[in-house]
UniProtKB/Swiss-Prot annotation:
CDD domains the UniProt entry points to: START_STARD1-like (cd08905)
Domain of life where this protein originates: Eukaryota
SUPFAM superfamilies attached to this UniProt entry: Bet v1-like (SSF55961)
Any one GO biological process: steroid biosynthetic process
Disease implicated: Adrenal hyperplasia 1: The most severe form of adrenal hyperplasia. It is a condition characterized by onset of profound adrenocortical insufficiency shortly after birth, hyperpigmentation reflecting increased production of pro-opiomelanocortin, elevated plasma renin activity as a consequence of reduced aldosterone synthesis, and male pseudohermaphroditism resulting from deficient fetal testicular testosterone synthesis. Affected individuals are phenotypic females irrespective of gonadal sex, and frequently die in infancy if mineralocorticoid and glucocorticoid replacement are not instituted.
Binding partners and assembly: May interact with TSPO.
Native organism: Homo sapiens (Human)
Designated name of the protein: Steroidogenic acute regulatory protein, mitochondrial
Disulfide bonds: none
PANTHER family, alphabetized: STEROIDOGENIC ACUTE REGULATORY PROTEIN, MITOCHONDRIAL
Name of the gene encoding the protein in the UniProt record: STAR
Length: 285
């Protein structure tokens, strides 16, 4: 695949390629994504994670009809990188330690990942079909502040293609105001591979959203949510949320760990209440 793509690029004259900016960008993207696929490939203990990681390389290996700018291509590649890194972390089952477990089975685990830091993993089962969760978490993303008190506001700043977004999120104070207001600028991508939906993201730069006065610019990533039907109960959804955040500022690690772990527990509770109180529309993952 990589050799064929390279021959395709080299077979055209320099002058011809110079006049086809869009094709050149897409060919470079195809080579880059194929390299990433080979570097990140390999067996994983989880079939659905392996399926997503393998098929997600199609984003770069297909020449899109839409012509993207250099910056848009960079955002697309960032989103792909976030997905690959996050799924790679989830696929490694070793080293996870239990932080908490609720009476309803909701479980938070954590581990330290080299070059990333401490990450948190929430595993829950929601009594709603996967399409309903996708609708709330992606299609109605900007409404999250209505039902999640840990989020004041989410705005989609730019949409790139069908499944990549640049977002600005303003988080509420936490831990009795010991953690002041934070905001995040992130690139997010949402994809479906077979019966699995993945929502991934990481911090990025966006010129039209500089740091705000009185708010600390924190950083996400890599992070992701994985949704798939519960085995044997397709009307229920298994949700796995990998959370990795650098809150910045001077905060004790004990406070950070407490805030992030509790954030995941609270999120699951608020999400269930939202799904129960608001009917589904026709959105599909």
């Amino acid at each position: 695949m990589l050799l064929a793509t390279f021959k395709l690029c080299a077979g055209s004259s320099y002058r011809h390629m110079r006049n086809m900016k869009g094709l050149r960008q897409q060919a470079v993207m195809a080579i880059s994504q194929e390299l990433n696929r080979r570097a990140l490939g390999g067996p994983t203990p989880s079939t659905w994670i392996n399926q997503v990681r393998r098929r997600s390389s199609l984003l770069g290996s297909r020449l899109e009809e839409t012509l993207y700018s250099d910056q848009e291509l960079a955002y697309l590649q960032q989103g792909e990188e976030a997905m690959q890194k996050a799924l790679g972390i989830l696929s490694n089952q070793e080293g996870w330690k239990k932080e908490s477990q609720q009476d309803n089975g909701d479980k938070v685990m954590s581990k330290v990942v080299p070059d990333v830091g401490k990450v948190f993993r929430l595993e829950v089962v929601v009594d709603q079909p996967m399409e309903r969760l996708y609708e709330e978490l992606v299609e109605r993303m900007e409404a999250m502040g209505e039902w999640n008190p840990n989020v004041k506001e989410i705005k989609v700043l730019q949409k790139i293609g069908k499944d990549t977004f640049i977002t600005h999120e303003l988080a509420a104070e936490a831990a009795g105001n010991l953690v002041g207001p934070r905001d995040f600028v992130s690139v997010r991508c949402a994809k479906r591979r077979g019966s699995t939906c993945v929502l991934a993201g990481m911090a990025t730069d966006f010129g039209n959203m500089p740091e705000q006065k009185g708010v600390i610019r924190a950083e996400h990533g890599p992070t992701c949510m994985v949704l798939h039907p519960l085995a044997g109960s397709p009307s229920k959804t298994k949700l796995t949320w990998l959370l990795s955040i650098d809150l910045k500022g001077w905060l004790p690690k004990s406070i950070i760990n407490q805030v992030l772990s509790q954030t995941q527990v609270d999120f699951a509770n608020h999400l269930r209440k939202r799904l129960e109180s608001h009917p589904a529309s026709e959105a599909r993952c």
